[in-house]
């Protein structure tokens, strides 16, 4: 209801842009009385339709079909962004959709997306060591983790994928542990770091070791527990070499841990 109220407060001369790849959004748009919105995504009903995705190691490429009421259908071909993952493609499509409705030319839109430098802590390449590439990402929610790992798997098909995960907030992990435990299916291994409590004082309420076992069961991956960043460094020095992708995930201190790994390995 809050989302519906928010969208219906957009004035008549404005527009909302809604990704209908999300099942909740599909339900929301059925209930919106004021139809001043556009839809986008891979869903075939999208007015800005993402098609023909080509996922490579350094970038994503796709076509964007534009199907707006009262206008001729058009396509922007070979849209390229220097980012990987469907979540980034959706974000780029949202930005493109807004600029298209503002009358910006397709040429400028393609150029702008191609030259976009990204943002910090979103699949940032940190360093390479013994053929292993290390990345840092802010993902700290089950859906984010799934999307990032899906993108990594599509881009790096031959490499072993290792996720270094630091849960953020005890309460979030406790409430969503089932969702979290199923989020790592596209990884080969998970290195589970201590929870970043973010000021929370209450007890965990379940055994962390059992959470590790739950990941093994639900995501079908190997799980390693480390107690601090120095143990992580020791593990990395002994095990992380060869063609591997190591991606740190979390909203806490894991970013610093990943950036200090070169000094520990």
Residue ranges and their predicted role:
Residues 223-228:
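Short acidic-hydrophobic, aromatic-tinged amphipathic segments that line or gate anion-handling sites
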Residues 1-134, 213-216, 222:
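Acidic, Mg2+-coordinating active-site environments of NTP-dependent enzymes
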Residues 134-140:
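Switch II (G3) loop of P-loop NTPases
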């Amino acid at each position: 209801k809050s989302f519906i109220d928010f969208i219906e407060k957009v004035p008549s001369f404005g527009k909302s842009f809604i990704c209908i790849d999300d099942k909740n959004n599909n339900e929301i748009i059925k209930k919106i009385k004021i139809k001043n919105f556009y839809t986008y995504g891979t869903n075939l009903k999208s007015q800005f339709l993402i098609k023909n995705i080509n996922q490579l190691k350094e970038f994503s490429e796709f076509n964007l079909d534009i199907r707006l009421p009262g206008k001729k259908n058009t396509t922007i071909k070979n849209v390229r962004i220097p980012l990987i993952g469907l979540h980034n493609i959706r974000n780029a499509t949202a930005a493109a959709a807004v600029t298209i409705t503002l009358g910006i030319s397709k040429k400028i839109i393609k150029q702008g997306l191609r030259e976009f430098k990204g943002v910090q802590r979103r699949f940032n390449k940190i360093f390479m060591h013994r053929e292993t590439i290390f990345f840092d990402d802010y993902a700290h929610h089950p859906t984010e983790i799934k999307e990032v790992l899906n993108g990594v798997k599509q881009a790096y098909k031959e490499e072993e994928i290792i996720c270094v995960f630091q849960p953020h907030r005890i309460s979030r992990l406790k409430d969503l542990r089932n969702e979290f435990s199923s989020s790592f299916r596209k990884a080969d291994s998970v290195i589970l770091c201590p929870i970043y409590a973010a000021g929370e004082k209450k007890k965990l309420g379940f055994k962390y070791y059992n959470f590790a076992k739950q990941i093994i069961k639900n995501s079908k991956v190997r799980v390693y527990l480390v107690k601090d960043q120095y143990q992580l460094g020791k593990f990395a020095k002994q095990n992380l070499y060869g063609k591997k992708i190591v991606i740190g995930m979390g909203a806490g201190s894991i970013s610093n841990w990943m950036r200090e790994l070169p000094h520990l390995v």
